[in-house]
Regions:
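Short active-site oxyanion
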Residues: 2, 23-26, 219-220
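PLP-dependent aminotransferase-like
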Residues: 17-107, 111
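A generic structural signal for well-ordered alpha-helical segments
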Residues: 41, 96, 120-121, 237
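Conserved PLP-enzyme active-site core in the AAT-like
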Residues: 67-73, 90, 115, 126, ...
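Active-site PLP-lysine loop of aminotransferase-like
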Residues: 83, 126-139, 153-167
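Conserved active-site segment immediately N-terminal to the catalytic lysine
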Residues: 105-137, 142-144
Length: 243
């Protein structure tokens, strides 16, 4: 089952409901993670138990997780594939099967990553991806479910208003025109009253504009372009002292 959303975190919200996670259920999450990545779990009333990751490899600390799985009685494990580099999904799948947990794969940066002929996210009970972070789209998130219960999972409500894309389009335009640093400086002088993550966020489908663009994209070419950009950046950073 695959569904398209406006944001990857909306896909995670949908997965929480589809997999039958309830308020009060415990989810093991990495201690190294952004607030927006786990916000849907908090919105659903789930209890988050952070686990350590190896600072060198960013792989989960499996011995610690084994202790936590016995003590906290969790329902699910969130596995993050950081920066497009995959964590070991085979180890995660085996761990979850051994302890009777659902496996949620955060593939926000791993949309175009494959291993052994399969895309990352194939091992989890649910995997969510960010389209707009890796492709030239105004919005877009993808949910892949191995099992969604009886019957087909209902798609999210469509968004058709152009106003829904306006903030993203303005931000992308500012970046293209070189105005992003000035905007950040202007925002820095305003008092911070809340995190960027809202108290709740209703799930909505990908915008039709983004969907039309997505259907026109050559994904293999986009993957190779991303890899070429990474190699170029890595080579240039290698020449910078202290990095």
């Amino acid at each position: 089952e695959r569904l398209l959303f406006a944001r990857a975190r909306m896909a995670l919200s949908w997965a929480v409901a589809a997999l039958g996670l309830w308020p009060g259920d415990v989810v093991l999450v990495p201690a190294y993670v952004t607030g927006s990545a786990v916000a849907p779990l908090l919105w659903a009333g789930l209890q988050l138990q952070p686990y350590a990751v190896n600072p060198a490899t960013l792989e989960p600390h499996w011995p610690m997780l084994s202790v936590m799985a016995r003590a906290a009685r969790p329902r699910a494990l969130l596995l993050v594939h950081y920066f497009g580099f995959p964590s070991d999904p085979n180890a995660a799948r085996a761990f979850c099967d051994r302890h009777g947990l659902l496996l949620l794969e955060d593939c926000a940066h791993s949309l175009l990553t494959r291993h052994g002929g399969h895309p990352w996210g194939s091992h989890g009970d649910a995997a969510f991806y960010s389209l707009r972070k890796l492709l030239p789209l105004p919005d877009g998130g993808l949910l892949r479910l191995r099992f969604a219960g009886p019957g087909r999972l209902l798609p999210p409500p469509l968004q058709t208003s152009a106003a829904a894309l306006l903030p993203l389009l303005l931000r992308q335009a500012a970046q293209a025109l070189g105005c992003r640093p000035a905007l950040r400086r202007a925002a820095a002088i305003r008092p911070v009253v809340a995190d960027e993550v809202r108290l709740s966020e209703p799930a909505r489908g990908i915008h039709p504009w983004s969907l039309r663009l997505l259907r026109r994209l050559a994904l293999p070419a986009a993957r190779e372009r991303r890899r070429a950009n990474y190699r170029e950046l890595s080579q240039r950073l290698a020449e910078v002292p202290g990095i």
